[in-house]
């Protein structure tokens, strides 16, 4: 079935989750529900629905070194292997989409997710994110590149506005995402909660 064959209501239902960690099935179209799990450093799967931050009820899982640490080696093969290992674990847990890797740049020391991002450099970020994505997807599990774009703070992240000129946006903030998408071809891209120059992602 092609997306062009779906009605507006059917397309809308594809964007609606059954809960925080599952997509909604559309049985009449042969589309099954998809289980998702957070996973930039290890598969964080919920035993049951938790709060929006997922701070409770996580199952035990393998935890790999953070992106900031793995980036120190500039080793794309290592990131591929980490991604593949996470993909295998996801398959064993019935997870079809891993929410990771994170590809934002570290532009300030107070960003609450600096550990989750690879680097200040868009080339290194994009290449390593692409390798991770290819590794995950080599096991038949989708990877979701996040948080597009300019997710630079956790404080009031749902209402913040990242203001920057177009050259900085293109050459720095979007370049890593561009490389990750072109070279990694992720199954999905997660938008950020913040606005960029007044427009929400």
What is each PLM-predicted segment?
Residues 1-201:
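Glycoside hydrolase catalytic-domain context in secreted enzymes
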């Amino acid at each position: 079935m092609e997306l062009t064959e779906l009605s507006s209501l059917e397309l809308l239902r594809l964007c609606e989750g059954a809960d925080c960690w599952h997509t909604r099935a559309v049985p009449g179209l042969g589309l099954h529900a998809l289980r998702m799990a957070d996973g930039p450093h290890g598969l964080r799967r919920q035993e049951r629905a938790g709060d929006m931050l997922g701070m409770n009820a996580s199952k035990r899982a393998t935890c790999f070194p953070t992106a900031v640490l793995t980036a120190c080696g500039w080793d794309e093969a290592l990131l591929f292997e980490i991604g593949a290992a996470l993909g295998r674990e996801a398959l064993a847990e019935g997870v079809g989409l891993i929410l990771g890797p994170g590809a934002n740049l570290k532009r300030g020391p107070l960003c609450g997710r600096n550990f989750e991002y690879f680097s200040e450099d868009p080339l290194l970020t994009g290449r390593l994110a692409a390798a991770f994505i290819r590794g995950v997807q080599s096991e038949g599990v989708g990877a979701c590149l996040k948080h597009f774009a300019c997710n630079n703070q956790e404080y009031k992240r749902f209402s913040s506005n990242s203001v920057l000129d177009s050259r900085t946006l293109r050459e720095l903030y979007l370049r890593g995402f561009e490389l990750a998408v072109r070279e990694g071809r992720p199954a999905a891209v997660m938008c950020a909660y913040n606005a960029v120059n007044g427009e929400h992602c």
